[in-house]
Amino acid sequence: GVVVPELVPAFDCPQQNPWHVYDVFTHIARSVEAAPKDADLRLVMLFHDTGKPACKTTDEEGIDHFYGHPTVSEQLAKSALERLKASRASMQRILPLIRYHDGHILTDEKSIKRWLNRLGQAGTLDLIDVKTADLAAQNLARTQPEIEELYRTKALLRQILERGDAFALRDLAIGGEELLALGYRGKA
């Protein structure tokens, strides 16, 4: 039998795309290798592109596209991880990273704080590691500048965390009760 049948369609799925030099399975294997030595992050990489074969389209110029594959990959991963009896904590860490692995993290404070609000500190750091591993397993001639940008993004993220900036309402040093005590009132 096959332990992870969700991977089988990736074996024979080429990626005719300037960003990729490997078929889907080879890309997955190389991204697992490029990921930090953390079981959950390596599982993210194992499943992050499993939805590509089901989403593959080829445009009139012969370029392959995989629109919507993060959502399909997340669904496949959820099914596989449940079958493999992954812990609830692992699934709560892994699935959002698969869902957002193609999301854009810009090297600016507003973008980083948006991701911090969505995924928290650990999740945002994990997402940068996932994106770095993903890019490292693509066409490095094209992706190396993006990898370097992710290093800068991670450095800026660490600065934001060291400063103790608020990135969600719960992080503010003052709340509604304090504002009311100071005399602030809402709309009459």
Model-derived segments and spans:
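Conserved, hydrophobic alpha-helical core segments of structured domains
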Residues: 1-145
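Charged substrate- and nucleic-acid-binding regions of tRNA-handling and nucleotidyl-transfer enzymes
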Residues: 79-83, 137-188
